Amino acid sequence: MLYNLLYPLADQVPLFNLFKYLTFRTGGAVLTALIVAFLVGPRIIAWLRQWQKQGQPIRADGPESHLLTKKGTPTMGGFMILLALSVSTLLWADLRNQYVWIVLLVTLGYGLIGFWDDYLKVSKKNPKGVPGKAKLVAEIAIALAAAAWVWSLQREPLAGALAVPFFKTVLLQLSWFYLPFAVFIIVGAGNAVNLTDGLDGLAIVPVMIASGVFAIFSYLVGHAVFANYLQIHYVSGSGELAVFCGALVGAGLGFLWFNAPPAMVFMGDTGSLALGGALGAISVVTKHELVLGIVGGLFVLETVSVIVQVASFKLTGKRVFRMAPLHHHFEKKGWAEPTVVIRFWIIATILALAGLATLKLR
C-alpha cells in the first residue's frame, strides 16, 4: 500500500524513492510485523484465556510432562501471527502483484481451516478436531485454486516446469501433472509444519529460518540480472514475495516472544497450517519446490516419522519410534523439552544453509 501510494510521488518527495527498493520494504515489513505482534499479543492472549478456560486439550497418550507443563495454555495464537503478517504485507507490498495475493490468500485460507480445527478441539474438548477427510478436501481445494492461478500467470515453458537444484537452469517439464504436484507441495507443507508444532518454539523458528531463505530466493529469482548471473530461472514479479517473507519473519519473532518456554500461548492449527501453506505456496511461485524439501527438511523428517510409524504398526504391529512425530520420540527417550527444541533448531539451520548452497553448487 505504501509503495502504491508514495512511490508515484517520488518526483516531488525524493525520500519516497526508497519505496522502490525491495530490500527497504522487506526490512520495513519485518519491523512492522514485529511491532504489531508485540502490541496485539497480550490482548489476544488475554482474550484466548478468557474464552478457553481450560486451554488446549492435551493428548493423554503424550509425554507425561505435557499434562503438567502445558495444561491450561490457550491455543489459536496463530491469530497473532496472521494479523501481524497481513497488516505488514498489505502496508509494504506492491498490491498490484498477484503473487502476493496468491500467497496471502493461501495463508489466510489455511489459517481458517486451522481455526475450524482448533475451535472444535476447544469447544468439544476433543484433541482430534475436524475429521481428517473434510480437512484434507478443504486444503486441496485451496491449493488447487492457488496452483491454477500461478499457472495462469506464468508462460510456457516455465508454467508447467519444475526446477532441479544443483543443475544450471534445468527445468523438468511436468505439463499438466504440475498442478497435482503443486497441490501436493502446498498441502504437504501445511501438514508438515502442523505435525512439527508440538513443543514450545519448535515450529516457529524453523518456519522463520525457511522464510528468511525464501526471501533471498524470491528476490534473486525475481531479479533478471541476478537470476542470469546465478544461472537460475527468472520468474518476473516473484521478488515481491521477499516482502511477504520478511513480514512472516517479523510476525514469527513477535509470536516467539510469547511462545518461548514456558509458552503463554500455542499457535495451534490456526498458525501452523497457515505458515506451512505459505511456505508451500512461495516455493510453487518461485519454482523451488525441491529446495523447500531441503530448507524445510526438519518438517520432512517429522512427517516421515509419522508415516513410518503408522505403516510399521499396520503392517507388523510394531512401532519404530517410541512415539511420533519424531520430537516426541526423543522426549520419551528422556531428552528435556528445551534440548529437543534447540537441537532441532540447529538441524533446521544446517538444512537452510544447505538449501542456500544450491544457488552456487551447480
UniProtKB/Swiss-Prot annotation:
EC number annotated for this UniProt entry:
2.7.8.13
Needed co-factor(s): Mg(2+)
Q: In which pathway does it act?
A: Cell wall biogenesis; peptidoglycan biosynthesis
Which compartments does it reside in? Cell inner membrane
Gene Ontology molecular function, alphabetical: metal ion binding; phospho-N-acetylmuramoyl-pentapeptide-transferase activity; UDP-N-acetylmuramoyl-L-alanyl-D-glutamyl-meso-2,6-diaminopimelyl-D-alanyl-D-alanine:undecaprenyl-phosphate transferase activity
Q: Which GO terms describe its cellular component?
A: plasma membrane
TM regions (residue ranges): 28-48, 75-95, 100-120, 134-154, 170-190, 201-221, 241-261, 265-285, 290-310, 339-359
Q: Which reaction does it catalyse?
A: UDP-N-acetyl-alpha-D-muramoyl-L-alanyl-gamma-D-glutamyl-meso-2,6-diaminopimeloyl-D-alanyl-D-alanine + di-trans,octa-cis-undecaprenyl phosphate = di-trans,octa-cis-undecaprenyl diphospho-N-acetyl-alpha-D-muramoyl-L-alanyl-D-glutamyl-meso-2,6-diaminopimeloyl-D-alanyl-D-alanine + UMP
Q: Could you list the residue ranges forming a coiled coil in this record?
A: none
Q: What class of enzyme is it?
A: transferase
The reply to whether Cell division figures as a keyword in the UniProt entry is yes
Q: Which UniProt keywords apply?
A: Cell cycle, Cell division, Cell inner membrane, Cell membrane, Cell shape, Cell wall biogenesis/degradation, Magnesium, Membrane, Metal-binding, Peptidoglycan synthesis, Transferase, Transmembrane, Transmembrane helix
**Annotated protein name in UniProt:** Phospho-N-acetylmuramoyl-pentapeptide-transferase
Organism of origin:
Paramagnetospirillum magneticum (strain ATCC 700264 / AMB-1) (Magnetospirillum magneticum)
Encoding gene, per UniProt annotation: mraY
